[in-house]
Amino acid sequence: MSTSTSMRRTPTLSLLTITITSLIFLSLFPRTQSEVITLTSDTFTDKIKEKDTAWFVKFCVPWCKHCKNLGSLWDDLGKAMEGEDEIEVGEVDCGLDKAVCTKVDIHSYPTFKVFYDGEEVARYQGSRDVESMKTFVLGESEKAAAKALESDKEL
């Protein structure tokens, strides 16, 4: 093998080694993808009507100081709820989807509501921390599911 051929292969081999090393390094870190689903005028009604599913939805606007002060709370809640069956965490930007917010009677921000089988079942007004919100939605979801089961038995 000539010296010039060997020199041309060295940069290619180095680049390949760096790429593989980088991919291995990045795979060691957990993904921080949010489990929060953005709901829009096109998706809101169908999503909250999902059978036997509770939706905990945050209604906000980008310019609201109180919404901004939530920081990563909603994303953190979405991650905390990831393993819970039949509970979804969603958000609506009332600046973009005013029709949705008008339909569900949103007049202040942020507003947090729980929907079950398409019906509003609760409004959250408690502490703004992941554990309190998680406890609330788990309890409301359980009550709504029991009520739905009772209604089904009556039919």
Task: Identify the residue ranges that each predicted region occupies.
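Proteins that catalyze or organize thiol-disulfide redox chemistry
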Residues: 2-155
